[in-house]
Amino acid sequence: MLIQDQVSASLVFNVTSYLNIIGIGMDPDKDFTWYPYGASGLDIYSNGVMVSPKLLKEKPEAVKGLVNAIAKAMADVLANPQEGIDIITATEPLSNGELEMKRLQFALDNLIFSDESKANGIGAVDAERLARSITTIKELYDLPGTPAAEDVFDASFLPPMAMRSF
C-alpha cells in the first residue's frame, strides 16, 4: 500500500520490509524514510521466545533446551553466516540467498548488535528497561494489570554468557 501511494506511512517489521523493498528493485534507504521506535524515543523490547505457562511448569528442561538450541544456532550463524543462508535456501527453494544474506546483516546491525547485547549477551534483558517496556505497553493499550519484569522474563533459562556473546 505504501509503495502504491495508497497510504502515507506504515508500521512495518523492518527486517522483512527492508529486504522486500530491495527484492522489488527499490532502495529502502533512498526511497523511504525509516523511523525506528528506539530512535524515536520508544525504548521497548520487541521479539523474544514465548512459551506457555503449562510448558514452563511441566517441562522446564524442554524450555531450557529450546533456548539453548536457539543460542547455538545463533552462534553457528555468527561464526559462519553463509552456512546459515545455505540452510535457508536448501529448506526453502523460493528464497534468494543474496537477499537472505542482506536480511541477516540488516537484522544483526539493526536489532542484535547493540551495546546492551554486547554487555549482557544475546537474549538477555535489562530488568529496568524491561520494566519500562511493560509500563509503556500497558499505557499504550490501556491494559488492566502490570506484570512484574520477572514474570515476563526468566534469565535462568539462558545458556552461559560465552554461548551468547559476540
Model-derived regions: residue spans:
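Pocket-lining segment of extracytoplasmic ligand-binding domains
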Residues: 3-94
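Glycine-rich, flexible loop/turn motifs
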Residues: 17, 45, 51-52, 118-121, ...
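Residue-level detector of family-conserved "landmark" positions at structurally sensitive sites
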Residues: 31, 99, 127, 147-148
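Intrinsically disordered, low-complexity segments enriched in small/polar residues
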Residues: 33-35, 43, 104, 139, ...
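Helix N-cap / beta->alpha transition motif
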Residues: 36, 52, 126, 154-158
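Secondary-structure end/capping motifs
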Residues: 58-141
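Conserved C-terminal helix/tail region of periplasmic/extracytoplasmic solute-binding proteins
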Residues: 130-166
